[in-house]
Amino acid sequence: MARQIKRFLHSELKHVSEWVYALILAIYACMVVLQLNSFPMWFCSLRENSFLGFFPDPTLRLSAEDVLLFGNAEVFRGLLFNVAPLAHALFFPFIAACIVPCFVSSGFVEEPWGLSEARGGKRVCAIVARAMLSSFALLGAFILSSVVLYCLNCAIVLDAQQYFNLDLFCYRLLLTSVVCLAYTVSSVIVVSYFGSGFGPIGMLLLVNVVAIYIQLGADSMLPLPSSMLMWTCGVTPLGNGQCVSILIDCLINVASVLAICFTVDRLRSRFL
């Protein structure tokens, strides 16, 4: 199996154009510029003791009413400074849904082994190889831009030393990266099974938009990537139970997407 994965890695790597990597870097360079020159809050839900959403401005000041709602202005600033560099995670699902098809050379049905008896093992190897390539490129750019933004905030914000907490930043970056990784793998599975047409990509994008708007009015975390990102990037304390829940939900998401795609593919091959 390891040899097959390696073979697929070389095959998919030859398929990916160098312009794709340049495009990813250009997109995230724009993300850095956008975050430094944008609104202080994106898609936020303010509630008692926790503000969900994306907060690109590390110098955001609370109003008197918001201070009473959150409970402690100093705790808010401490959390805000260390999660602000992750705000551009809002766009990650949309970027991934559009870029992942570039890492998929062809759909499973189009492959010469698409309907063979050995398709199961080869499909798993193909998904693993494609997920590795796309995750390395997308997550690498995401993590790099987050670190760059954190360093810029440390240099620009006057009271950065007071709120600097590298452990908190790395912890939130890790959680956010896990959610992004799960979404990338799910996107690879969907595109591998159903292609990169308007239907599959449109469905991926629609789920993200719907999840954000539902989470704005929901009291608890939804087991959807965009919803989980609003928590990991939000100015809200996360307990160990919530972090474990995020990891479990990520695994369930990937497994659910794989199960749905596999079932639909079997039905399609049987009746078509």
For each predicted feature, which ranges?
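Junction motif at the cytosolic side of a transmembrane helix
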Residues: 8-11, 252-272
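Central hydrophobic cores of alpha-helical transmembrane segments
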Residues: 21-29, 197-211, 223-228
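Secretory targeting signals
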Residues: 24-103, 127-197, 204, 233-253
